[in-house]
């Protein structure tokens, strides 16, 4: 299964705070960034390193740097923006590619309305960010788009994932690893994750919240 649930105590604690029904926009936004940063730490743990020499205070010293492919972070609009600053706090040199995906609330199917990909994205590691992996339709559509653009290495980071969304991504793209703070119970009849976080986009941007 292309999924890794990160059960670090800091992540569990912060995610618990995010589940509160009365959480403020400010606190939800800050926690989304913090958990996004912690997921980034785990999702980049296997990046290749190479050694090189520098002049230190006591002479020449061998140090390491990240080698291999450069990174592009791909927030799925709009909610993915809420994790972006946290991710970039750890990989500030990454380029940002934005993908806008909207979900039909009746059919629960996704359609892409915006794509702003960095040049030569086919030579980069693409790291998709989106707070919720619910039905999986938005994630699958984004991965489809990135692969069509030539991306060969793609990872995804989500705050909360539903089993239905995980299964959808696994069926369509079994080569894509998903990192999540929590695998939740299920989707409700409206396609929202239970227990979930509610509508993450609304909570990040302070717009109308839905009870889901």
Swiss-Prot record:
CDD domains: PRTases_typeI (cd06223). InterPro entries: PRibTrfase_dom (IPR000836), PRTase-like (IPR029057), Upp_B (IPR034332), UPRTase/APRTase (IPR050054), Ura_phspho_trans (IPR005765). It catalyses: UMP + diphosphate = 5-phospho-alpha-D-ribose 1-diphosphate + uracil. Its cofactor is Mg(2+). It comes from the Bacteria. Its EC number is 2.4.2.9. Pfam families: UPRTase. GO terms for biological process: UMP salvage; uracil salvage. GO terms for molecular function: GTP binding; magnesium ion binding; uracil phosphoribosyltransferase activity. Pathway: Pyrimidine metabolism; UMP biosynthesis via salvage pathway; UMP from uracil: step 1/1. Belongs to the UPRTase family. This is Uracil phosphoribosyltransferase. The gene is upp.
């Amino acid at each position: 299964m292309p999924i890794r649930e990160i059960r670090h105590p800091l992540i569990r604690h912060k995610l618990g705070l995010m589940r509160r029904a009365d959480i403020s926009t400010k606190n939800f936004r800050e926690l989304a960034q913090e958990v996004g940063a912690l997921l980034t730490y785990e999702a980049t743990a296997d990046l290749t390193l190479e050694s090189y020499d520098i002049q230190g205070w006591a002479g020449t010293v061998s140090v390491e740097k990240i080698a291999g492919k450069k990174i592009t972070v791909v927030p799925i609009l709009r909610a993915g923006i809420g994790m972006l600053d946290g991710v970039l706090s750890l990989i500030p040199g990454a380029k940002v590619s934005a993908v806008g995906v909207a979900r039909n609330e009746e059919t629960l199917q996704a359609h892409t309305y915006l794509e702003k990909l960095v040049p030569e994205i086919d030579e980069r590691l693409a790291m998709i960010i989106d707070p919720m992996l619910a039905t999986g339709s938005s994630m699958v559509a984004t991965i489809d788009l990135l692969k069509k653009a030539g991306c060969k290495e793609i990872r995804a980071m989500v705050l909360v994932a539903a089993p239905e969304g995980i299964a959808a991504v696994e069926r369509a793209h079994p080569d894509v690893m998903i990192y999540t703070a929590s695998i939740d119970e299920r989707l409700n009849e409206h396609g929202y994750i239970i227990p979930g976080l509610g509508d993450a986009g609304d909570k990040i941007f302070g717009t109308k919240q839905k009870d889901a």
